[in-house]
A protein has these predicted regions:
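Membrane-aqueous junction of the first/signal-anchor transmembrane helix
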Residues: 1-166, 170-179
Length: 179
């Protein structure tokens, strides 16, 4: 009889351990947009200055700061991080952001690498600082005037795509709203 109780105890202990392990591994990534700053610039005699009209805009740039918390007991990954500009119906433009931590210089010019896959340790918070931009040449800014929503997308360790809203604004009225 004691042998049967011992076997049942072992089986129940194994099942309980498996359940507790599964529960502790069942977590997810929480993304918080700490800051989003975008601006339009134009070239005034060799110097980039803030723009006040759609017609003068030559450059568009953004800076994004993300706080990412992994609530799981296992490391999580973010791959193929992309910024999506949308008009509520379809994607207008995709941008792979540059990672501020990869800055390197050549002379007086700074360069940055595209964001690489990011591993987030278990029960940890990391901060990402990203940026990118567009130039008006070859209709490079046409998409922005049709934009109504901006998203960040990434793929997780199971290649599932997740979409996070960053900003909702009608960019056709950008300069009227930002005087």
């Amino acid at each position: 009889m004691e042998a049967i109780i011992g076997v049942i105890g072992t089986i129940l202990g194994t099942i309980l351990g498996w359940v507790l392990n599964s529960v502790s591994n069942h977590g997810k990534l929480y993304l918080y947009v700490s800051s989003w700053d975008d601006n339009f610039l134009y070239n005034e005699v060799g110097c980039l200055v803030p723009c006040i009209s759609k017609e003068k805009a030559e450059y568009y740039s953004y800076k994004l700061t993300l706080d990412i918390y992994n609530s799981s007991s296992e490391a999580r990954i973010m791959r193929d991080i992309t910024i999506i500009y949308s008009d509520d119906k379809c994607e207008l433009h995709k941008s792979v952001p540059k990672d501020d931590t990869t800055r390197y210089s050549s002379g007086s010019i700074s360069f940055y690498n595209d964001i690489a896959p990011v591993n987030i340790p278990p029960k940890a918070i990391i901060q990402l600082k990203l940026h990118d931009g567009s130039h008006h040449q070859n209709n490079g800014l046409d998409y922005i005037w049709k934009t109504r929503k901006i998203y960040l997308t990434y793929k997780n360790e199971k290649s599932k795509t997740t979409k996070i809203a960053i900003k909702s604004e009608d960019y056709s009225c950008y300069f009227e709203n930002h005087k």
